[in-house]
């Protein structure tokens, strides 16, 4: 089975390290990022230096339209997804909970809760034998 992974929040930290590990394990890799294109392309260069086929794709995982576009891009460039690492997340930096706006709270929930569910939904639509897939793995 071909190994294709999407790593959300793949431009730094745990996501970047996961991309490097996936490269060593022979995966074709999509490094998803939300805002730091420069960091994502830095990870992309490192992954490619290890011999992996890889792309960097900007998408806001809290938007189903953007998640759909992300998965379609990966389908076209790398093939059917066989693994998903839901790593993207956001926190309330320098905010006290009693000072957080409803907008900020909803943004955190959309990214950290809705995002992984949307990504898992679209991964399962590709991985599940019910939908023509051959199985796969999702890491949350």
Task: For the regions a language model picked out, list residue spans one by one.
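Active-site loop of short-chain dehydrogenase/reductase
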Residues: 3, 52-53, 80-81, 127-140
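Conserved glycine-rich cofactor-binding loop
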Residues: 11-13
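Conserved glycine-rich Rossmann-like NAD(P)H-binding loop of the short-chain dehydrogenase/reductase
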Residues: 25-42
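The beta1-alpha1 cofactor-binding region of Rossmann-like NAD(H)/NADP(H)-dependent oxidoreductases
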Residues: 37, 58-70, 102
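A glycine-rich helix->loop->beta "capping" turn
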Residues: 50-53, 73-84, 93
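Substrate-binding pocket helix/loop in short-chain dehydrogenase/reductase
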Residues: 95-97, 104-109
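A short, exposed helix-loop element centered on a Lys and neighboring polar residues
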Residues: 120-121
């Amino acid at each position: 089975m071909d190994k294709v992974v999407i790593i959300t929040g793949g431009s730094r930290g745990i996501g970047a390290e996961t991309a490097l590990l996936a490269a060593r394990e022979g995966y074709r890799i999509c490094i998803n990022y939300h805002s730091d294109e420069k960091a994502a392309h830095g990870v992309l260069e490192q992954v490619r230096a290890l011999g992996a086929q890889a792309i960097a794709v900007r998408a806001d995982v809290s938007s189903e339209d953007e998640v759909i576009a992300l998965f379609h891009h990966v389908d076209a460039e790398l093939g059917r997804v066989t693994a998903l690492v839901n790593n993207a997340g956001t926190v309330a930096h320098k905010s006290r909970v009693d000072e957080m706006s409803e907008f900020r709270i909803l943004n955190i929930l959309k990214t950290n809760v809705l995002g992984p569910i949307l990504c898992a939904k679209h991964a399962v639509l590709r991985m599940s034998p019910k939908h023509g897939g051959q199985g796969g793995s999702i890491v949350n």
